[in-house]
């Protein structure tokens, strides 16, 4: 009754929760949604007896203006993760290949396998960045899609413009490159590709961003993709009907129109991020988290949990979200306590 290959597909593991603990395991912001977004959600719920606008026309129009693209070059989905899955479904058939860095966003291989495609994971370099040369070398006649996570989750590293340009010279025009910029608003790298520019240089590049992180709408699930109109149309074709609810659309639109207020919050996170990097001796990061590679992540997570701090432990290292001043102070006090002995 059940597909036999599902037994081999890993289950997505969300960040851990503990009652009364400070949750730094899911790269969420600690701020509530912007006031305008809260008001928009309240208003939208009065129409919850009606289906949402399946085409999300008003939101897509605003995004098109924001991104400086045409209306048919942008779509929205139930978080950028859903759009990643739609991109796989739109490009891959049984036996096709999806290339991605590893470790990176852990849903990439899941989405590939669910679609019947073959996941091709390329290990990060020693400095925890994309090995773009190895990713290019892995391209075969079965490759249909390549994900680049910039900044990368969980390492927080970014690639340079020259690295991306060199990589794209090796990518066939019929292979789609998904430039996943879920942490775009936190990125302060001077030399790195930006999807809004790359989609005009390459017809096979699709940008992917979200309202879940910097915008503080993780609980409402809304993201957006932009680029080649033909690819966007194909992504819409495989989307779940009415996936982005009315409240999510309203909140995203209101948040998009409150950019100045949003960036004030983001700057606080960036400031605290740099302080955490210094205190923990972590490598520089361009996201709202720090990455501590190496063994012992589970042990570190257990010790911090004893002090009311929940982080994310991976086999390759520990990822710690950075939020606001109050939660950063709690983290640093806990860090000092476990290292005092």
From Swiss-Prot:
Record's keyword terms, sorted: Aminotransferase, Pyridoxal phosphate, Transferase
Reported cofactor(s): pyridoxal 5'-phosphate
InterPro entries (UniProt xref): Aminotrans_II_pyridoxalP_BS (IPR001917), Aminotransferase_I/II_large (IPR004839), ArAT (IPR024892), HisP_aminotrans (IPR005861), HistidinolP_aminotransfase (IPR050106), PyrdxlP-dep_Trfase (IPR015424), PyrdxlP-dep_Trfase_major (IPR015421), PyrdxlP-dep_Trfase_small (IPR015422)
CDD domains (UniProt xref): AAT_like
EC numbers on record: 2.6.1.57
GO BP term, pick one: L-histidine biosynthetic process
Annotated Pfam families: Aminotran_1_2
Disruption phenotype: The absence of this gene and the ilvE gene results in an auxotrophic requirement for phenylalanine when the double mutant is grown on minimal medium.
Transferase is among the record's keywords: yes
Record keyword Transferase present: yes
N6-(pyridoxal phosphate)lysine: modified positions: 213
GO molecular function: aromatic-amino-acid transaminase activity; histidinol-phosphate transaminase activity; pyridoxal phosphate binding
Catalytic activity: an aromatic L-alpha-amino acid + 2-oxoglutarate = an aromatic oxo-acid + L-glutamate
Family from the record: Belongs to the class-II pyridoxal-phosphate-dependent aminotransferase family.
Subunit description: Homodimer.
Function: Aminotransferase that catalyzes the conversion of aromatic amino acids and 2-oxoglutarate into corresponding aromatic oxo acids and L-glutamate. May catalyze the transamination reaction in phenylalanine biosynthesis.
Entry protein name: Aromatic amino acid aminotransferase
Species for this entry: Corynebacterium glutamicum (strain ATCC 13032 / DSM 20300 / JCM 1318 / BCRC 11384 / CCUG 27702 / LMG 3730 / NBRC 12168 / NCIMB 10025 / NRRL B-2784 / 534)
Lineage, opening ranks: Bacteria, Bacillati, Actinomycetota, Actinomycetes, Mycobacteriales
């Amino acid at each position: 009754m059940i597909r036999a290959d599902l037994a081999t597909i890993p289950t997505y593991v969300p960040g851990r929760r503990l009652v009364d603990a400070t949750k730094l395991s899911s790269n969420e912001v600690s701020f509530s949604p912007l006031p305008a977004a809260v008001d928009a959600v309240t208003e939208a719920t009065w129409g919850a007896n009606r289906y949402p606008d399946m085409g999300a026309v008003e939101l897509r129009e605003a995004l098109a203006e924001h991104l400086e693209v045409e209306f048919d070059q942008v779509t929205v989905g139930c978080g950028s993760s859903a759009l990643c899955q739609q991109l796989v479904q739109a490009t891959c058939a049984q036996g096709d290949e999806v290339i991605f860095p590893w470790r990176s966003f852990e849903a990439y291989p899941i989405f590939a396998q669910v679609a019947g495609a073959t996941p091709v994971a390329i290990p990060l370099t020693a400095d925890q960045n994309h090995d773009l040369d190895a990713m290019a070398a892995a391209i075969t006649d079965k490759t249909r899609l390549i994900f680049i996570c910039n900044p990368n989750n969980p390492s927080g590293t970014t690639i340079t413009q020259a690295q991306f340009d060199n990589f794209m010279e090796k990518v066939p025009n019929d292979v789609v490159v998904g430039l996943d910029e879920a942490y775009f608003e936190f990125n302060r790298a001077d030399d790195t590709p930006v999807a809004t520019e790359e989609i005009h240089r390459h017809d096979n590049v699709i940008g992917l961003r979200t309202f879940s992180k910097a915008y503080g709408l993780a609980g409402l699930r809304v993201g957006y993709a932009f680029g080649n109109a033909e690819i966007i149309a194909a992504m819409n074709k495989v989307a779940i009907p009415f996936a982005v609810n009315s409240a999510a659309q309203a909140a995203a639109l209101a948040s998009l129109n409150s950019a100045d207020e949003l960036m004030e919050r983001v700057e606080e996170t960036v400031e605290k991020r740099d302080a955490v990097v210094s205190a923990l001796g972590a490598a520089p990061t361009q996201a709202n988290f720090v990455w501590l590679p190496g063994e012992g992540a589970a042990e570190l997570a257990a010790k911090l949990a004893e002090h009311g701090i929940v982080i994310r432990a991976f086999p390759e290292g520990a990822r710690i979200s950075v939020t606001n001043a109050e939660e950063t102070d709690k983290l640093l006090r806990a860090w000092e306590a476990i290292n005092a002995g």
